[in-house]
Amino acid sequence: MNPLLSAHCSCSQEIAQQFAHYQHISGEGEIYQTSLMSALIAGVYEGATTIAQLLEHGDFGLGTFNELDGELIAFDRQVFQLRADGSAQPAHPEQQTPFAVFTFFKADIELPITERMTREQVHQLIDRLVPSDNLFCAIRIDGTFPSVQTRTVPKQQRPYRPMLEVVKQQPVFRFQQQHGVIAGFRSPQYTTGINVPGYHEHFITQQRTGGGHIQDYIIRSGFLQIGRVSRLVVDTPVSRDFLEANLTPNNIRTAIEAAEK
C-alpha cells in the first residue's frame, strides 16, 4: 500500500483535496468481463460462463444470472444471488451468467466515511479522488446505511423480452438502518455498450439475507476502498442469440441509462 494512498481523516473534503493533485495514476490489475452490456439490453439472457470460472478471473464483481434470475454480487471470493423477492443466497459454482464483471480487488485508495453522505456525494468524492474518467475503478464500501433502495430483475422465460421491457416490472426494495456491503465499478464513458458507463453498484446486507441493484442510498458511516484498473478483457459468447443480436442500436446509451438507473 502506497502511504500516499491511505488516509485516516474525518473530513472527506480534505481527503479529496489531498488526492486531487496525485496525478501519476497508473491503474493496476485487470477487469474480466463476460459478454457485453449491449447484448444484455438486446435480450441475450443466457451464457455459458459459470460462477466457478468467474472466480478464476477475480474475487470481486457483479453481474446477473442466466434468464436474468436475480443480481450477482461478489467480494472476498463469496458470490451471492440477489433474488427478485428481495432475498439473498450463496451462488452455486455451476450456475451460469450471461453478463458479469470481475476483478481481483486491490485497493490503492482507502478512507473512512465519518459523515452522512448521499450516493451522489459519495460519487463526487470518488470522482475527486480519481479525476480521470479514462480508468476503471473497482469500489467497495462497508458501512451503515440509513436507507438503501434497490431493484432486482425477475427471472425471464423464452421468448425473451428486451431489457427495457423487463425493467418496467422489476420490484423495488427499501432497506432501512442496515449494515452492509456495496460492490461496484465506475467505468469510463468510452465503454458505453461494452459495459455500464459511470457507476454500477450492488448491495447486500450484513446478514447476507437481502440486497439488489442499487438505485439510491444514504450512508452514515463506513469505509471506502477504491482500486484503479487500466486493463479490460472481454470474453464474448458464440451462442446464436449473441451472434444474431443487434449490439449497436442507435439508442444504446439511453437504453443502458434507463435499464441501470
From Swiss-Prot:
| InterPro entries (UniProt xref) | Acetolactate_a_deCO2ase
Show the Pfam families listed in the entry.
Answer: AAL_decarboxy
Q: Which residues cross the membrane?
A: none
Its annotated pathway?
A: Polyol metabolism; (R,R)-butane-2,3-diol biosynthesis; (R,R)-butane-2,3-diol from pyruvate: step 2/3
What keywords sit in the KW lines? Acetoin biosynthesis, Decarboxylase, Lyase
Q: Which GO terms describe its biological process?
A: acetoin biosynthetic process
What are the recorded GO MF terms, alphabetically? acetolactate decarboxylase activity
Write down the EC number: 4.1.1.5
Catalytic activity of the protein: (2S)-2-acetolactate + H(+) = (R)-acetoin + CO2
**Residue runs in coiled coils:** none
Enzyme class, broadest EC rank: lyase
So what does this one do? Converts acetolactate into acetoin.
**PANTHER family assigned to the protein according to its UniProt record, in alphabetical order:** ALPHA-ACETOLACTATE DECARBOXYLASE
| Family statement drawn from the similarity comment of this UniProt entry | Belongs to the alpha-acetolactate decarboxylase family.
The protein here is known as Alpha-acetolactate decarboxylase
Source organism? Vibrio cholerae serotype O1 (strain ATCC 39315 / El Tor Inaba N16961)
